[in-house]
Regions:
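Catalytic cysteine-centered active-site loop
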Residues: 5-56
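Aromatic- and glycine-rich peptidoglycan recognition patches
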Residues: 33, 75-110
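Mature, Sec-exported extracytoplasmic domains of Gram-positive
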Residues: 41, 65, 102-104
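Short strand-connecting beta-turns/loops that link adjacent beta-strands
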Residues: 54, 65-67
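Structural motif
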Residues: 57-58, 78
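Catalytic nucleophile-His microenvironment captured as a short glycine-rich beta-strand/loop
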Residues: 67-76
Length: 110
């Protein structure tokens, strides 16, 4: 679904991307869907999906700080793909204590 890339905050090419640019690039490559560039813009499109109804491809949003948001792509089975500021593009689990405590909501944008 996604190309492997290193992470650089604010990056927009495949040598490094932030979380929202990664999601934008994957959606363009995989689904030919044009998403907005920033997390603040991405969280306003599509519609919210209940936790139990989330499906592969839905966006998953987190509140990681007072004004900081993070976005990834849900893959199913409690797993999501995202660009981490410290580890690059990785798979993580929603039941990981950190992600569980910062989970905000899912959105379907397809």
């Amino acid at each position: 679904m996604a190309k492997v890339c290193l992470n650089r905050l604010g990056g927009t090419n495949y040598s490094g991307v932030d979380c929202s640019a990664f999601v934008q690039a994957v959606y363009q490559d995989a689904y030919a869907v044009n998403l907005p560039r920033t997390t603040a813009q991405q969280v306003k499109i599509g519609h919210k999906v209940a936790y139990d109804n989330a499906q592969s491809g839905d966006l998953v949003f987190f509140k990681t700080g007072r004004k900081t948001r993070h976005v990834g792509i849900y893959l199913g089975g409690n797993t999501f793909m995202h660009a981490s500021t410290s580890k690059g593009v990785i798979l993580s689990r929603l039941d990981n204590p950190y992600w569980a405590s910062t989970f905000w909501h899912f959105r379907n944008v397809q």
